[in-house]
Amino acid sequence: MIGPTLAPLFALVIVAVHRGLAAIGDQFAFDQVLPEPRTCIQDGCLQGRYYSDLEGRPYEAYLGVPFAKPPVGRLRFRNPVQNDPWSGDYDATWERSRCMQKNDVKPQQTVQGGEDCLYLNVYRPRNVTGPLPVIFFIHGGAFISGSSSMAEFGPERFMDTRKVILVTPQYRLAVFGFLSTEDRASPGNYGLKDQLFALRWTQRNIAYFGGDPKLVTIAGQSAGSSSVQHHMMSPQTRGLFARAVSMSGSALGFWHYDVDKLALTRRQAEVVGIANATELTTEQLVEELREVDGLELARSIDKLKVFYVHPVTLWQSTVERYVDEDTYMSEDPRVLWESGNYYPVPYTVGLLDNEGSLYSSIILSNRSLLNEMNDHSVEYIPLIVGAYHPTSVEMLKDRFFPDGSDERWLTEENLPNLQKMVTEGVFYHSIIKTIKQSVALKSRTSPLSVFYFNFTGPYSQSYLDTYTYGDFGIVHADELLYLFRSSGGVPDYQVGSPVWYMAKILVDYYVDIAYNGIAGPLCTAESCQLLEFTNSDNPNKPVALDLIDGFDEEMFTFWDKLYALQNY
């Protein structure tokens, strides 16, 4: 039964069906050549360009807009610095470089991008009166990869609605974004501070684009999801947004807390050939690292790994022990969240069925990697989920791989449990903990809602991750294929197809959040129903919106006990 709170969403399905795609035959043709769009902001004037949405109507794009000085040279491993204004028109018709990265989560990747990368894109519908709500979307990528590229995050589906403005920022990644000596020499959190700068830019300038600075929704996926939760807890971001959406990631995940940041920085120095790295003061260490070629720094991430790409999440947020006016976070996020010491805005949390495929699908698709992992089961398998305590290792073996030997855990029969283990440990536990601790607060004043994306379509991120067509189910980041046009990954959806309806419904759900704060059932301590997006057998309504009850409490308790042994 669809309750009153879901009536608007359910209506979206009906509306989409009844529209029947009449608009497609109504392809918008320009009667005349339009002058390119131009908008003046506090820093100067921007010359943008027009693109067409999926219905052929023009929308404005302002690409590669600077929000901070290039973090190069002496600005490497420093907090972002306000960019200088310019005279004349700034050419915002082309995308700038992605931040320097080696995406070692995917096979056969090389170093991409550059250090001069602190730019954002702004998209707005043409000839729509404002002020419009703003969606500020933070990309994922384990804090080591990703960009705001139109090829990955095409805005067309949001522009089709003609109801919101979309902002997509870039931020420093990996060693460039998160190197920390845990003191004044390099406090860290540069990637999060870059996002903060982009949020401040949005507050100062979005009204010039017809956006409403009082209705900014910050949304993110994976590492972007964790970033959203971090921003809710940082005192620096108060008042910069009005709603928040986290998809498939949490700031409470073990991977934020299982690395000695200073030891990692010294190890980083060693692998790029800095002599006596363990003996240098932190100031000397950072100065030496500033002199290393950026390409060499980015490439060296492979030398920091234990097995294949693991641990993936080495470069992470830091509790800043050196506190000044620029400090992003000086208290442990786990303490802040549990105590309710965060910005109380309407909050939506999302998760998918097979989140763990992000790490497991590549291994399961590669027999050589699988054999290597199995040969070192006791060391490598617990590493993936941050389990180092001997009792934790035993718990994993007993729960997921009971039929394996003590030396080789994996068998053909229990291989699916590898993905299940990663899904539960890396993703579900911390996401559910985020939700449980939030609704348990007696002082809580802001609403929370949870959605579960469980829709199977013809395309999947696992195809892009593994370069195969192996079926790993509904995997980490699959929902992005419906929110954004992915010209670099999948073809446009056929109008009227089930995937077309799914994309429209999910985008409208996000737009509803941008306008109203919450678009699904409320999650409370007494009752937490998840809004499920899934397939329907009804050809006239190919997307079903269902309500499912709560979470697997036994699973959550298992991981709670396991991570308590690690003191996460």
Task: Please annotate each region the language model reported.
Residues G3, V17-L192, P213, S487-L506, ...:
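Non-catalytic accessory segments of hydrolases
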Residues G140-A142, S222-G224, G294-E296, F455-Y459, ...:
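Short, internal active-site loops enriched in acidic
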